Amino acid sequence: MQNTELLLKKLTLEEKCALLSGAETFKTRGMPEHGIPQIWLSDGPHGLRKQAGESDHLGLNPSVPATCFPTASAVANSWDAALGEEIGAALGEEAAAQEVSVVLGPGLNMKRNPLCGRSFEYFSEDPYLAGKLAAGYIRGIQSMGVAACPKHFAVNSQETRRMASDSIVDERTLREIYLTGFEIAVKEGHPRSIMSSYNLVNGTYANENKHLLMEILRGEWGFDGAVITDWGGSNDHALGVKNGSTLEMPAPGGDSVRELLAAVESGKITESDIDARLSELLPLVFDTKAALDAAPREFDAAAHHALARRAAEESLVLLKNEGALLPLAAGTKVAVIGDFAKNPRYQGAGSSMVNSTQVDVLLDKLIDSELNVIGYQQGFDRHGKPDAALQKSACELATQADTVILCMGLDEIAESEGLDRSNLRLAQNQLDLLQAVAAVNPKIVVVLYSGSVVETPWLDNCQALLYAALGGQAGAGAVADALTGKVNPCGKLAETWPLAYADVPSAADFATRRKTVEYREGLYIGYRYFTTAEKAVRFPFGYGMSYTTFAYSDMAADEEGVSLTVTNTGSVAGTEIVQLYVAKKNSELFRPAKELKGFARVTLAPGEKQRITITLDDKAFRFWNVKANRWEIEGGEYELLVGASVEDIRLCEKISVHGTATVHPYEDRNLDCYYKGDVLHVSDADFEKLLGHPIPKGKTKIDRNLTLGELNHARSPLGWLVWLVLTILLDASYKRGKPDLNILFQYNMPLRALAKMTNGAISMGMVDGIVMELQGFWILGLVRVIYEAIKNVVLNAQMEKRLRGA
């Protein structure tokens, strides 16, 4: 094992700077002459994605086979941190077997809005639940000697303009909603690394944000690991290093090294800043490499498939079961309809896409079950194209069955990294099919596949609804067992399902092309809004049915937590997820009507009862006092609410809590809309009162951070031409129903990323020449690009020669 302090004394400043950026798409820079190995990083929120051949960060090229577990959005419905730890351990084992040192996950972004195209990679709208689950994944991954890298830190809630948007959020909302999940993950999971997000937060890029990285992450939480940029996410490398960012990825080449050297020479940063970052990076490199050297080069694929199936079982959510249609009895004549039954949708698209070791198919599992499968019909084109013949054949089959199992859902391109959803609806051809089938056979079980919320105005057309989410490669077996009663669904929703998208508090301001993203709703995301505003929803946070019933009784409560008795009052074994919410009536602060502060899973046989305890931690009663700039507690009476969902509260006890608050955070501000939870249309004036300063105006500037999708603002024919070509290609891909993820990434990419993602082929000086061209200085810009290109080639060659010691 290398001694980092001694090693730092041996390295030249240039060598030190070179170590702080990647060498290839997923590899760090090694220096064998100093005993510093090169290590692999790999995507892997729900399955490893190591690309043995040509690598990319969007999941476009195939990867080495790995187990595809249910996505984070699915596993979150299990409310089982221990299960997350098991999945994490399997991910870590597969990473070690494939010689991957850092697993880039789990994803901890808060689900501010259900249209986020990447919601399937994230756990919940609630930071407490998300943090607890993420901590489990992290502990599991790192139990195998591999480093976890939770992401994306922070306030990154949309894919639109994700590399160049500025999240404008007040400090209390930042702390209580968008950072608490990361805080729990860091303090309880102890990750060796963390990934910064692409976006700016209140005017400063997250990767160089001193408030986020130094004051909060490293200062308050005690994080001492490596902060890794998202791929191409570095804006000012030197400022990032100074303010706590460790490793710039993927492969910016020698220009990045020269940027740091120049910053040291100018006094912008010091060599001590660079040493501090290497003291975070090098132990990670040495420790993980040593663990990988001792790890076996294979894993038990069958055992991991079995774990993936159990995870899918625990993640299923029964949303409707009219007349106890489910479970289906042996011998029931069933018609299986829907393309997803034969061609499963089990994961999302983008950088998390896994090349699965195997994939189970629901139709096959149903045929192998005790049901009498009388036939299968595709029913609809999964990409939305109307097809009357498919619908007619499905209806003819449905007339012959006792029960119809209809598999519906979102297609592969509806949810993906790189683009946000345009609506919450299922394809119209699927809804038409459901209505047509219901007309000939009302006994319909809908099995729904999606990574996030969908609107369900069609709910009356089915008797049962089983939410399969994106259940991973073994999800089909879990669904079949749930339909037949071998598995009793126990999952509960980790996000609210609204009646309509218009009800979502951020609906009016989500995924616009504006530079600034204004978090006007403040604390009120998800159930925090719906319960406070008393707005009806389709399915509330924490909701999920079972084939049995549970009774809650004999509650006792104090500041430490609650205890109660849970009894299985039904006829089959089952698992209940008991939820603890905290509420404060007549608060002097504005706050959500109730907030999740604890939960517990309990598995009971028929008639069995068990006494359970749910403890409260230091986050149970705290709020961020923006005036005192610290966590405080408002004293007084609180309600501890125990229930089966945020709306189904079974027991309540009141306790008195001693307060610490000495100054009212909002005594000089009129914030009536926030006290009422009336945040659908927050005015500029009210949002500025919440922020405590004027709303920043995001102006389009022709500089390094101009995105390719904004080149129509350029004063250059070349810029307009590039913009026009990209726009035409992108629009064409949308019309085909298959948005091109690569073009989408380029469209939202700032010019500076050209210098961060081309392995040194393009320097920042060349980017500055391009900017001059776009500003209208056509000749000077072209000359600058040519000059900087020649200079870059020469300097890169000289630097590589020095670094190789030649």
Predicted feature descriptions by range:
Residues 1-619, 623, 637-641, 646, ...:
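Glycoside hydrolase catalytic-domain context in secreted enzymes
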Residues 47, 368, 507, 572, ...:
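A generic signature of intrinsically disordered, low-complexity regions enriched in glycine/proline
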Residues 618-665:
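Terminal connector regions
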Residues 646, 653-723:
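Charged, amphipathic alpha-helical linkers/stalks
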Residues 689-806:
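Long, low-hydrophobicity ectodomains and other hydrophilic envelope-associated domains
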